[in-house]
Amino acid sequence: MEIRKRNGKSVPFQQEKIFNAMKKAFDGQGREIGSRELNEILAAVLDNLAAAAPLTVERVQDEVERTLMERGHYEVAKAYILYREKRSALRRVRHTIAQTVGDDSLDEVLRRIQMDFTEEVYSLTALQMKFESFCRPGMTEDERAEALTKAAVELTTAEAPKWEFIAARLLNHSFRCRNAREWEGRGVGDLYGRLRYLTDKGLYGDYILAHYTHEEIAMAEDFLCPERDELFTYSGLDLLLKRYVIQSRSRVPLETPQEMFLGIALHLAMNEGSDRMRWVKRFYDMLSRMEVTMATPTMSNARKPYHQLSSCFVDTVPDSLDGIYRSLDNFAKVSKFGGGMGMYFGKVRAAGSTIRGFQGAAGGVIRWIRLVNDTAVAVDQLGMRQGAVAVYLDAWHRDLPEFLQLRTNNGDDRMKAHDVFPAVCYPDLFWRLAEENIDAPWHLMCPHEILTVKGYALEDYWGTEWEKRYLDCVNDPRIEKRSVTVKDIVRLVLRSAVETGTPFAFNRDSVNRMNPNGHTGMIYCSNLCTEIAQNMAPIEHISTEVHTENGDTVVVTATRPGEFVVCNLASLSLGNLPVEDEAYMERTVETAIRALDNVIDLNFYPLEYARLTNQKYRSIGLGVSGYHHMLAKRGIHWESDEHLAFTDAVFELINYAAVKADTALAREKGRYALFEGSDWQTGAYFEKRGYTSEKWRALAKTVAVQGMRNAYLLAVAPTSSTSILSGTSAGIDPIMKKFFLEEKKGSMLPRVAPELSMDTWWYYKAAHLIDQSWSVHAAGLRQRHIDQAQSMNLYITNDYSMRQVLRLYLEAWRAGVKTIYYVRSKALEVEDCESCSS
């Protein structure tokens, strides 16, 4: 038997639907009825319908009403009539909206919205009224669909935050309609055909179809779960469609969100051999469920012809003309492909130093940093976004006072560099004096003069050895000093931090003390977003020779590649993960570690130096986002001991899972080249962190035998963009506000804290209202479990005194926090890094 629905379509008749509807009517009246009696009523309804032809939905519902009243169930029949009327009203508003837009297929989307968002505050009647206020004569169907989405966006408030999910569904529907028309117009059907088309147009890397068969692509297409689009907020989906999916050269999106996730998974699983389709599925599920986000360059560039997947690079600038310009050239090439940069200037001679014996000839680091600044502005990724670079200088460098005023608004503009991000490398001695004797003298010196006079580079040492040599230099009258007090430097640092948000802080002794690969090198600085801490070494010129090849004169320059650091990043979306489920977390971390390891081998490198370092150390940086989201969902206040205990446990679990996954990967694919003698191999890594439990001791023994696949594992990036994609809070930061309006291209875009509700409301305390000591203590607890560093911001208000800000720096240093990113004053807007947005 078939029944004709209101849209005219005939479908199989399902009598259980009548049973369920009547049961709901009885339940709604608080009337108990047994299954036997209900089945008798159903049988009577069916008997009376037997002669009905054709059978329609309205005819069935009329018969249910009549049968209920015949049996004396008048109140239930009345409730059923009211229920029908309510459903009819819901259908009418859906029909009206769909008809106004001119898209009949929209009705099903609206029906799902009514089913999933049942609270009165999400009534489609409100949407209809707002939408109709935007409609104007002569609008196209696409313009009306856009107006409908805009209406849902504007209905988003702190009291009705789920409108951002409704807006996302409407945006996704209109996008999918346009996308289907685009492919229909190109005469392309299945996924393989679309990938072939994109490849032929130079929009998709030909390596994907070269590695996968037609049958494998068809299998991958079956992995797609379009319903996961419903996980997007409007902000996340809008960002993804504008910046992450593949677009034609006329900026028309040609890839759905789920196809984007699948394309990334296909790329990252390419080298997995016969088992690759299993890993395609795991990578796709991890990404499409928004449990893990890859860094912005990986999300944007995986599957494309120029697949530069790394976020950040770090270079050690040599103290020579050739070396400095080589570093500038390296930065330009990195910036061209969307990478951010960290540059260590601690080896470059200070202003007034000698050049080839000529006194006072050197111009100092500021002149070179201004060239870096201009390069960042000039190399702007096809006009999309200017380059981004952090420049690091040691706290004892003679050019430090001028360096600390690079971005301030007062002083000589010829000594400014407003488009770079300055950062200072602090030894323990500096903070110890700031804490114990802030009026103590502090001596600024030129690294070139020290090397010339003493025969060693002071910046090549750390800890007690650095202190011993620093005092040796201070007491050597042959070395010129620029003597100030610690207080003078602290004042300059804090004044700049409050005014500009910078300099970033790099605690060099804390970093090197916990470096698991200290046996092969030293860490001089961090990257653009202060989460990377890996061994560094400058590129060295060896020789320049002239050869004749095939009758042509060829100039060959030989260089020693040094250690040019590369950051391959991803983030666990803690707000979207069951962090208490150890098995689930271990599986998720294992999948993410494997994906990051594959990035190393599948990456397109803008520089050979980067490729060589990355393949030698195989360093990765798995971090987190959704930290505040995670706490709020569990009813944990930021300013509480419960927060501190919880974060300690969660990050120990993440670290354990990461080390366990990495050593298993080493057994399968081989250990990194410099494993022998590392803290991993000797067990010092585990001892330094106090990992003494039975399971940690067992894991340490396994690591010593099997090795580690990657030299560095964990690094917490800011995730400013990718956290929006996954609908969670950024990095380890507290939220800025529960709800606010962001101005974007002339319109106001609502931003809502993740899963904001009456249950989470009181656990979302705004960043600037939080006692920052709690944030610092939490960072110290996390740092124990993170072998690299974390992008940790300080949030201050205008009420903070300089002494209070200094106290936070000192607390962070004492807690073992390796780096501090921005100092975000409430009155200050600072630019987020997009490269490290994992």
Residue ranges, per PLM feature:
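Internal maturation/activation junctions in enzymes
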Residues: 286, 328, 588-611, 619, ...
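Function-dense linear segments that define catalytic or interfacial modules
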Residues: 246, 252, 261-276, 280, ...
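Conserved, charged catalytic cores of large soluble enzymes
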Residues: 180-274, 357-371, 383-387, 392-527, ...
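Core nucleic-acid recognition elements
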Residues: 9, 32-262, 278-284
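Alpha-helix capping and helix-loop boundary segments enriched in small/acidic/polar residues
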Residues: 6-13, 33-36, 101, 252-255, ...
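Short, surface-exposed, low-complexity cationic segments
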Residues: 14-32, 106-120, 262-269, 730-735
